[in-house]
């Protein structure tokens, strides 16, 4: 077996057997099955086995990945076999070799215990043998027989078992590697490489991977090698460098090493330079040459594809693209720099082990990724350098990165890779590098082998003395690449976000996206304004900037100034979209002239401006026209080759196509694709003539331009089809324009176009009701339908199943498939018949709005009969339905951005309508909702649009109601209740907070939220509940429909309704939740106001505007509160106690800031469920003794409770408290011992001016705030706080001495 990057073994399998029993029967069939699976098996070629085992055989065992031991009756009669077994057992223990025992007509227990017939034979063999040798045999027999294997007695026949053994071995050898699965973006690279390699082709193929150092070429190649190895009998992943100046000797040395590795033959000698071709010309090989910088190496090892057998693939990796060209490698994968969003994921994967940062590191991570640049190596290095560091250390590092304009700091980081790789390994406590959650990062690209590095980081003063980037005492543990090449920050030339970042860096002073203003954005837009495309540019940059981590409310692209600038730009330009129509004709061909006119008319009809551009007879190409268009329709005819000037223009157009986002749509007019591709017919004659009269390089550019056009595909003109073709071409152009601004359609088409499936392709599209799933599916269907033999689009599948039932729909489907004339019914057609009938036909099937997987299977007869060449697209509101329909990765349709919503509004509303921003907000990016709302407010008779919009929210258009109702009605009672609580009370709240409270109400909240997400009714954004406003409105409408009288509804949120219920004392047991915004409200409540609300679970009286107070008074006191309450949130509670009758047995959160309470209540209460208590700024509070009963408390907030003096008996002595905030408790003097509070992370005593004594610290504290206290000394236990990151001692004027702290704690704090 060839050597690879993951360790070299000469053989895949070593078989150990007794030739007396199995060589001609069982073994022969097994070897045949292994060979059929391309498994490299050692064969002894008739080696005599009655001699002592020789060194060659021992070497073969040690250099095999798997040993198959075939125990048979006479296996133990051979000392050779037994000695083999001892060696195999040794390799099993010491080299982790895989051993597969096979029991051929012998029972495993006989082998293990050496009994029965097997034991008799073994006993004879042992006679006269040394005891130590017999002992080794017995130990090996017992150990190997104890390994799970295959017993022929348990199988119906040999053939079945042999096939299973071969399959098992194949899986063990070629199991999919996890080394690369966690590398961000690797799948996209592998898909791109697969399309270049064309693995289905039997023709040998040589391709290149090019890109700068650190871009990830080697990592991509290693992942590719891991993925493709099972398909090749011989494979090798090698890196060679010149070590000898003598060309001939160096080449022989290269060949010897190369053939030794790929053929698995040690010390192989070659005599001439033709050995590679002679040895491999009939072999199917996979060869990857890494880090190539010598053209002679390529000529020597992979001179031509003809040197290798059919199906071979050779991949050459280099930084030098010209080296590939010089070796005639034209299929080159140029590794692109990652987008800003992908760069952030790469950085986070290294820093946090996941592709997104923790919430408190989000902004820091975004800026670090931005400052690291776009080179994957630098992103990984910096991420690993920051791995495990505390937030304060990140903040300290920022100035160095911001000032690192020349890359000196990053270069320093990259110079210590081996040192820090070992540090990280040690920090992970010896865990396996590939263990789940600890991604193995491959940063070895272009890393020279053989160097030896110290395990200690050199002194900063000695190694960084030439830079002022470090203080003398800094020790920076980092992982980096030893490469000394630093590539400047570059991205694709057509990457708008990169261009914007570059623009900011060139400002004076330099800026970054977090520090720029709206004026900076406008200045950038002025540099990029071309023919009205500025709006689309802003739309893309809004998406990129927010993917980069900028909050929408802080995004300068969304500012009023930028919006005003866009309006002014629209008023100045007012151009429609221009589409270029290229041709090369002399007006003598009537058909071509007529066709161009048909295209122009169709473009006008669709609202575009056609710019017809004849390349014939033009001296110069109009570059301004090129840059003013996003789509070019190119009519290719034989006239092109009659004009050298036209061909030069064609080259220029294709160069422009490669460097911009221009879309080219070729139309082959009276020429065939094969003529241009193979330069046949008139093209062949013309180019032969041009070859004779012109420079070769000019002709080669023309050929390259022709090849590039052919690679795009396009449409072929046929006589009589010009009008149909014109419509199809313009529809394609329109769709391509839409693609450039529609991330949804673009994403789906990218998935379809890169699909390499050898089986049926089943794609799923899911999203909320009204998001546009049907429209997108229809566009895809119309775009792809011409390429299929049979196409079927079944719209409104859910509705059709209700109207016709699945059986009738199946009859319709069968009749469409086979045609009415065949007279076949559903009962006549079995899946096997369907499979055979359509095996060689292509099928495109779209099922729109599927709500039940069983119905879908019933209509189409299951998914099993579909095969390669068949594509099924399903849309659904439910992700789980798509998964049940065998969709592997459902594509979620994203909501419209604000800019897309704005453009849609402008199609209906003229001028600056005052309600546009409210329309955009109320629609939540749902196209259906936005269209219906905009259409409604655009009617002329409406005088007050804002009032009309509010009425629409209370009574939405029928289509919105129907779309929502169907999703809601399909939920179970648990999910319905959770949804209504979220809609009425928890939209925008933390998911964990909602789960905490609603679980206490008896709901299965986490499961319910997951189901609501799958049903597209809610989503999570930064772990917060996100719900489209139309859905929230509908949820509240459902509650409103429970009863006309608010007192009989389950949930109340409207202040008017709530005040009516409370002041009239009309509450009933129907009410389960009340959330009242009491800003600017003043009212008196009765003592029995909650007397009949037995089922009230959630109660919240609050003020949403700062400066206001909740003025709900209880002049006659309060008799009771409902015992079902899990949330009691009452700001400015007016009484000194809670009702004595109140039993808080279900209470989870007590939130009563700014209350008048002196104590909660008299006596003890059951506080088992209480998790959070907030009594902040309750200035009269003196007694919290009852909290000692709350053993599950996690958060206590008593900030500003200025009357609290002694809490020594009040803090619960349990290990569940996480935070204790007693800031500004100015009379507090001491705290109890905290040694048992093992989960306490935060202690805040700042502003406790009389606080003097602290006995000890909780052992796992991370944050301690003691600013402004009167403490005189700190307890010695502070030295043991290994998790401490913040220690605030500001203005501790009485502090006399402080224990000496470990260096680690000082550095963290």
Swiss-Prot record:
The keyword Magnesium does not apply. The keyword Acyltransferase does not apply. Residues 488-585 form the ALOG domain. Keywords: ATP-binding, Coiled coil, Hydrolase, Leucine-rich repeat, NAD, Nucleotide-binding, Plant defense, Repeat. LRR repeats lie at residues 1145-1167, 1168-1195, 1214-1237, 1238-1258, 1259-1283, 1285-1307. The active site is at residue 84. SUPFAM superfamilies: L domain-like, P-loop containing nucleoside triphosphate hydrolases, Toll/Interleukin receptor TIR domain, Winged helix' DNA-binding domain. It comes from the Eukaryota. Pfam families: ALOG_dom, LRR_3, NB-ARC, TIR, WHD_ROQ1. Residues 1114-1141 form a coiled coil. Residues 187-418, 755-987 form the NB-ARC domain. InterPro entries: AAA+_ATPase (IPR003593), ALOG_dom (IPR006936), Disease_R_plants (IPR044974), Leu-rich_rpt_3 (IPR011713), LRR_dom_sf (IPR032675), NB-ARC (IPR002182), P-loop_NTPase (IPR027417), TIR_dom (IPR000157). Residues 9-173, 574-737 form the TIR domain. It catalyses: NAD(+) + H2O = ADP-D-ribose + nicotinamide + H(+). Belongs to the disease resistance TIR-NB-LRR family. Disease resistance protein that cooperates with RPP2B to confer resistance to Hyaloperonospora parasitica isolate Cala2. This is Disease resistance protein RPP2A. It comes from Arabidopsis thaliana. The gene is RPP2A.
